[in-house]
Amino acid sequence: MKHFKVVEEETDAIYLSEKELSTIHELDLSDDKQLEEIRDVFITGCFTGLRYSDLSTLSPEHIDLDNEIINLKQRKVHKAVIIPMIDYVPEILKKYNYDLPKIPRYIFNERVKELGRRAKLKQKIEVVRKKGKEREKRVYEKWEMISSH
């Protein structure tokens, strides 16, 4: 049997503030349609708490406009959820006729960092990785840590 080393990371929860999300939402991305779509999917995820896998399957049948809610069964945990459409979500969903753009996850995660870079999210984040008894510290700017969940 092969032996594997366990790599652990020590981090506090990293999140974006409402101001940072607003800055990302307000970015002029007219020069890059794909990045604009990624931004809209990302913002929708932030304000609904939906995982990327659920956002990628969101369709008009999940939207209840009368009650301003999203009603769907989460893919990962197979649980039905009802989510209020708040902040930017109604505007974004309407923009795409209630059917968000379908973006491959690897492209999404690769390019979503660019949103943070353009929004100048430069707060320093320290990540400590443990490999056996050794601890390796590395510092990232906040934009480098952005990804889907």
Q: What spans do the regions from the language model cover?
A:
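Basic, Lys/Arg- and aromatic-enriched nucleic-acid-binding interface segment
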Residues: M1-Y52, S56, D66, K76, ...
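Generic anion/oxyanion-binding catalytic loop in active/binding sites
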Residues: E10, T44, N97, E144-M145
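Glycine-rich, flexible loop/turn motifs
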Residues: D12, K79, K142
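Basic, alpha-helical nucleic-acid-contacting "clamp/cap" segments
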Residues: T23-L27, D64-I69, K73-K120
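Short, basic (Lys/Arg/His-rich) helix/loop patches that form interaction surfaces
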Residues: S30-D32, Y98-K102, E110-H149
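A short, basic/aromatic helix-end/turn motif that makes direct DNA contacts
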Residues: T57-I63, H149
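Active/binding-pocket-proximal capping segment
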Residues: E61-D64, D87-V89, R129-R135
